[in-house]
């Protein structure tokens, strides 16, 4: 971890020493700014039972700039597009250097528990969520079974 800002070293040490329940985040062996993340689908959500792989990258400007995060596992969610990009205010205009990797991961986990079709990234999924929520939830469960189980 030579040459890394002290803050990144401290955050990484804390993530490894005190993992967030349901979330595993490990720095890549060759690049300590790149994290392999696995989030367990939250209980009582359409994603329950799934394990979702994400990648998180800390740009040179971090913590003045937000981490770059995306889902690697396909997910049927109104706030995640086909490329795995996530619509989350703290990853964009609401980012603050006071926030940490841990906060970002908790916010993504919360987004799985409470999809927000009113601020969509995947418009087709959001429309389905608004017009027929039961059907959208069933599709999300089916995608979870298909793409997020037995995938680790």
Swiss-Prot record:
Pathway this chain belongs to: Protein modification; protein ubiquitination
Location of the UBC core domain: 3-149
Active site: 87 (glycyl thioester intermediate)
Keywords: Acetylation, ATP-binding, DNA damage, DNA repair, Isopeptide bond, Nucleotide-binding, Phosphoprotein, Transferase, Ubl conjugation, Ubl conjugation pathway
Catalytic activity: S-ubiquitinyl-[E1 ubiquitin-activating enzyme]-L-cysteine + [E2 ubiquitin-conjugating enzyme]-L-cysteine = [E1 ubiquitin-activating enzyme]-L-cysteine + S-ubiquitinyl-[E2 ubiquitin-conjugating enzyme]-L-cysteine
EC number(s) recorded for this UniProt protein: 2.3.2.23
Record's keyword annotation contains Zinc: no
Domain of life where this protein originates: Eukaryota
Posttranslational mods: Conjugation to ISG15 impairs formation of the thioester bond with ubiquitin but not interaction with UBE2V2.
Keyword Methyltransferase in annotation: no
GO terms of biological process kind: antiviral innate immune response; DNA double-strand break processing; double-strand break repair via homologous recombination; negative regulation of TORC1 signaling; positive regulation of canonical NF-kappaB signal transduction; positive regulation of DNA repair; positive regulation of double-strand break repair; positive regulation of intracellular signal transduction
Entry-linked SMART domains: UBCc
Record GO terms (molecular function): ATP binding; ubiquitin binding; ubiquitin conjugating enzyme activity; ubiquitin protein ligase binding; ubiquitin-protein transferase activator activity; ubiquitin-protein transferase activity
Alphabetized SUPFAM superfamilies for the sequence: UBC-like (SSF54495)
Pfam families, per database record: UQ_con
Signal peptide: none
Residues with Phosphoserine modification: 131
Annotated Gene Ontology cellular component terms: cytoplasm; cytosol; glutamatergic synapse; nucleus; postsynapse; protein-containing complex; UBC13-MMS2 complex; ubiquitin conjugating enzyme complex
Record's function text: The UBE2V1-UBE2N and UBE2V2-UBE2N heterodimers catalyze the synthesis of non-canonical 'Lys-63'-linked polyubiquitin chains. This type of polyubiquitination does not lead to protein degradation by the proteasome. Mediates transcriptional activation of target genes. Plays a role in the control of progress through the cell cycle and differentiation. Plays a role in the error-free DNA repair pathway and contributes to the survival of cells after DNA damage.
Family: Belongs to the ubiquitin-conjugating enzyme family.
Name this polypeptide is given: Ubiquitin-conjugating enzyme E2 N
Species the sequence originates in: Rattus norvegicus
Gene encoding the protein: Ube2n
